[in-house]
A protein has these predicted regions:
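Aromatic- and glycine-rich beta-strand/loop motifs that create alpha-glucan
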Residues: 1-24
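Terminal transmembrane helical anchor/hairpin motif
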Residues: 40-69, 201-287, 292-301, 319-339, ...
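Secretory targeting signals
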Residues: 67-68, 75, 122-183, 187, ...
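Junction motif at the cytosolic side of a transmembrane helix
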Residues: 2-4, 14, 280-314, 347-366
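Helix-loop-helix units of permease transmembrane domains in multi-pass membrane transporters
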Residues: 94-126, 292, 296-297, 546-566, ...
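Function-determining sites in protein domains
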Residues: 365-374, 383-730
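Long, hydrophobic alpha-helical segments
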Residues: 73-102, 113
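Internal/C-terminal transmembrane anchor helices
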Residues: 310-320, 350-392
Length: 730
């Protein structure tokens, strides 16, 4: 039996044989960690000379990025070095198994295989771990010398050290597994890349193909199942997740939550990283123990696994490559996806056979696994192209729907909410309708499903059918079905104005639903920093209001909004709008600002969020009278005498179709200049009569709640005599 002293001796001897790697590890980590961090922090402190940047603001920013300097989250060179050292430690520690002479020599010594495995594994860890820990604590010391270290940052830094170590162990163990699976260094490198990268690409490609082939598919940002799974089942995805979570500053005021990251979001990746590392370590040890001496020099250590590994690699590889080609070229999926996938899998299988045998004449010997790979690709493509799983045709039974939400695309452009930028915001998922309107929303979803089945496609947000009539244009609408079982299903369907407007109008008859979707009812008035007002001139003017007047204005607006007819909200023409600026509750310094400190003493300037969706209609008498009493009169049209000049930029399509030629013929002679370009035409005028005629024909537009209008690629810029100006597409 080998004693502990002997183990230490063997580990030291192994490190001595790899002394170049130990020196390299110490040098690059020293340069990339304490040296880089000292320079970076000094550079950030020098930013205090910039007007508005206070010492407190700079310190706060340094603390926010400081943990990421330790684990590589905010210093990518450290991340790359961790990966590189993991590969080198595995390759140098287990390279002997790829040489028959070295393998026979090692196994002739009075040590069991598992003892050699443990010695190589531990020495590789120490080559990285010792310099990494030393340099990590040097960074923490630099932070302390610069006066930024506090107890919360110290804890965050230790978590970052843990994250960096775990990422190294994960990648290192994965590479060790690749070494024990293969018999040559080249194939070990390919196997390592495959093990580290392929799960991430496979799972994200599944998500991509679902989006490409299923018209009704929708995955909420941050909640895509296969993307989230890739962050836990892929060494690369999990490493990225670990660096992000552990490289975050954990302020004491956050209590049990990180800045934008909850405690479970930290613990789950840590647990997943430990579990994956342990599983790969056990598998590597088992393979090392069974590693045949004759495997050295062969492509694979266990030849019987070759066909299985070939199929498992080539089928997903074909889809990954084909999907990437589609992303870069925009090729037609219906025409090219099947033949290109078959061609790709054929090339991959032949390439793998060549790697196995290193003989071009023998690449057809594995024809059975090649046929299986081709058949597998053909079957999967058929499922996708013909929707054999019935994804697009599936509609939950209304009796099984506990509640349903609806979100037309235009809502996302019309409203901005106080909670929209929060880490847990679900505003982008839609608004649950009142229980009594569940049947109405389900019926609307069924209408959208029928539209999709009839071939109506709306590929992306704000893309419409080619019909000239806005009544025949279709808008994507997201439906979220929460079933009685608790399961949540997302689908998006195309709906036109005739179908969508009456349904939304009916929903808005319910006052509680209005309170749900309009941001004024979600507003914490203590967060309001300022209110801007704009009329037909569309130039925002900050209202000079006391706190009491601000509250009275919001009261009047809420009263008008609840009293308005639903048709006004869905089909009315706004004559003005309000914009409410609030302190951003998800940015540092907001709490201090609200507690009475000036913006300059905290951040240099306030962190604000501008909220939209506060249109003014002629029926809003309380709000309009309140503004008029304060001296803010709403102008319903632009006076040409107030305009200094007006310019129109027409797209090439508009020029070639003579879309506005009739309008331009009515302009007074010589009142406008026309300049043609290869991409279109510019029209400029400062003549009041020409300006009046143009504005009558093309008035400044406002975004509507249900906006089916389509920007034609033409734009207008208006410069007023007071120096203000606006620009918009029409």
């Amino acid at each position: 039996m080998t004693s502990k002293i002997s183990y230490i001796k063997f580990i030291r001897e192994d490190i001595r044989h790899r002394s170049w790697l130990a020196v390299f590890s110490a040098l690059v980590l020293f340069l990339a960690m304490p040296v880089y961090s000292a320079i970076y922090i000094d550079g950030m402190k020098g930013a205090q000379t910039v007007p508005g940047n206070t010492s407190a603001f700079i310190t706060q920013n340094i603390r926010a990025i400081f943990p990421g300097l330790i684990n590589g989250q905010n210093a990518m060179i450290v991340c790359y070095i961790i990966f590189l050292l993991a590969v080198l430690c595995a390759a140098t520690g287990y390279g002997h198994i790829h040489s028959r002479e070295k393998l026979d020599f090692y196994h002739s010594l009075p040590l069991r295989r598992m003892q050699w495995f443990s010695i190589s594994y531990l020495s590789g860890i120490l080559i990285f771990l010792i310099p990494y820990l030393i340099n990590s604590f040097l960074i923490i010391a630099i932070g302390n010398m610069n006066g930024i270290l506090n107890s919360a940052l110290a804890v965050s830094s230790l978590i970052a050290v843990l994250g960096g170590c775990l990422v190294f162990l994960l990648i290192y163990t994965t590479c060790v597994l690749a070494m024990t699976l293969t018999g040559r260094t080249v194939t070990a490198l390919l196997a390592g890349v495959f093990l580290i990268v392929s799960p991430l690409f496979i799972l994200t490609t599944i998500e991509s193909l679902e989006q490409e082939f299923f018209a009704a598919y929708y995955a909420p940002p941050g909640k895509a199942f296969f993307v989230n799974l890739s962050e836990l089942l892929s060494p690369l995805g999990l490493s990225s997740k670990l660096l992000t979570c552990t490289g975050t500053y954990f302020p004491a005021s956050a209590g049990s939550e990180l800045t934008g990251i909850t405690l479970p979001e930290l613990l789950i990746p840590l647990a997943a990283g430990i579990i994956m590392t342990v599983l790969f370590l056990i598998l590597s040890a088992v393979l090392y123990r069974k590693y045949p001496s004759e495997a050295a020099g062969n492509a694979l250590a266990f030849p019987r696994s070759a066909p299985v590994l070939k199929v498992l690699a080539c089928i997903p590889g074909a889809f990954i490559i084909t999907d990437m080609i589609h992303a870069f070229t925009g090729m037609s999926l219906e025409k090219w996806f099947f033949p290109l996938s078959i061609l790709t899998v054929l090339i991959l299988t032949l390439f793998v056979e060549y790697i196995y045998r290193m003989d071009l004449r023998a690449i057809w010997r594995g024809w059975k696994s090649t046929l299986i790979s081709i058949a597998g690709v053909a079957a999967i493509v058929s499922v996708l192209q013909f929707d054999l799983i019935g994804y697009d045709s599936y509609m939950p039974d209304e009796d099984n729907v506990a509640r349903i939400s609806i979100l037309p695309d235009s809502f996302s452009n019309y409203f901005i909410y106080p909670s929209e930028y929060g880490p847990d915001s679900e505003i982008y998922l839609g608004f649950y309708v009142p229980e009594e309107d569940t049947a109405l929303a389900c019926s609307l979803a069924e209408t959208g499903l029928r539209n999709a089945e009839n071939g109506i496609e709306v590929p992306n947000t704000w893309e419409y059918s080619e019909s000239e009539s806005s009544d025949e244009k279709y808008m994507k609408t997201l439906f979220r079905f929460q079933l009685d079982s608790g399961r949540v299903i997302y689908r998006q369907y195309p709906l036109n104005r005739e179908q969508l407007v009456p349904a939304v109008r009916s929903l808005l008859e319910n006052k509680e639903f209005r309170k749900t979707i309009y941001p004024v009812f979600q507003l914490n008035r203590d967060d309001v920093y300022s209110i801007n007002f704009s009329d037909s001139y569309q130039v925002p003017v900050e209202l000079n209001l006391t706190d009491e007047q601000r509250s009275q204005l919001l009261d009047a607006y809420e009263q008008d909004l609840l009293a308005a007819d639903a048709s006004t909200l869905t089909e009315g023409t706004a004559i003005g709008s309000l914009e409410i600026n609030i302190y951003d509750p998800f940015q540092p310094g907001t709490e201090a600002l609200q507690n009475g400190m000036t913006a300059d003493s905290v951040l240099g300037s306030p962190n604000l969020v501008g909220l939209s969706g506060f249109d003014l209609y002629p029926e809003y008498t309380n709000t309009l009278e309140f503004l008029e009493n304060l001296g803010y009169t709403l102008r319903t049209e632009i006076d040409p005498e107030d305009v200094e000049n007006l310019s129109i930029t027409l797209s090439l399509d508009s020029v070639q179709s003579a879309k506005y030629s009739e309008l331009f013929r009515t302009l007074p002679d010589g009142s406008a200049s026309f300049t043609q370009y290869s991409t279109g035409e510019d029209v400029r005028t400062s003549d009041p009569e020409a300006i009046r005629l143009i504005l009558d024909a093309i008035p400044p537009s406002r975004t509507e709640l249900l906006d089916f209008s389509e920007d034609g690629g033409d734009s207008m810029e208006i410069e007023y005599k007071d120096g203000a100006g606006i620009g918009y597409y029409f």
